[in-house]
């Protein structure tokens, strides 16, 4: 049997070994806990970095969109000098300028087209029958009276040339007697014209013929 004095150092060694094991276990546990904590912190840090990267990307996208929407200031364009238009060749104009309200152009507005004008239909005038037509429609008696009146009036006209006085008889002049001879067609009117023509001839021309 071993001596009793040796029991105490053995027990002390065993107790020291147990304590050493406990310390080792605690250290390993602490190391594992620390590793777990460090792993969690690393994951959180990575997540925070990822979130920061996403936020940065969103901010960059918003900035690019805002820059696209911002109005772009264009450089002022230099004003070019007005081009000179060559004068048009003169066009032949009418002899008389138009003064109608629908053709005269107002300043700054184009010339208005002329409105179609309706020509007024002229009523046919009643033409006076000439002496030739009147003689065709005369009876033989009226034609005979005209043949007697006209030579008398012609003789009065020849004798009165150069005289300033107007020849009149019964308020009838040589001109009125000539018109009656040419245009009257009734026998009574022509008979009175013949009598007045002979009276006018006797009044002014018979004396000169006798001389």
UniProtKB/Swiss-Prot annotation:
Acidic residues bias spans: 24-65
Pfam family, one: Adeno_L433K_22K
Residues covered by region (RS-repeat): 160-180
Keyword line: Host nucleus, Host-virus interaction, Late protein, mRNA processing, Phosphoprotein, Viral capsid assembly, Viral genome packaging, Viral release from host cell
Coiled coil: none
InterPro entries: Adeno_L4-33K/L4-22K (IPR021304)
Main localisation: host cell
Location of region: Necessary for nuclear subcellular location: 154-181
Phosphoprotein found in the keyword field: yes
Post-translational modification: Phosphorylated in vitro by human PKA and PRKDC. PRKDC inhibits, whereas PKA activates the splicing factor.
Biased composition (Pro residues): 83-92
Extra facts: All late proteins expressed from the major late promoter are produced by alternative splicing and alternative polyadenylation of the same gene giving rise to non-overlapping ORFs. Expression of packaging protein 2 and splicing factor is controlled by a L4 promoter distinct from the major late promoter.
Subunit structure: Homooligomer. Interacts with DBP; this interaction occurs at a unique vertex during genome packaging. Interacts with IVa2; this interaction occurs at a unique vertex during genome packaging and seems to potentiate IVa2 and 33K oligomerization.
Family affiliation: Belongs to the adenoviridae splicing factor family.
Free-text domain note: The tiny Arg-Ser repeat region (RS repeat) is necessary for the splicing enhancer function.
Protein name: Protein 33K
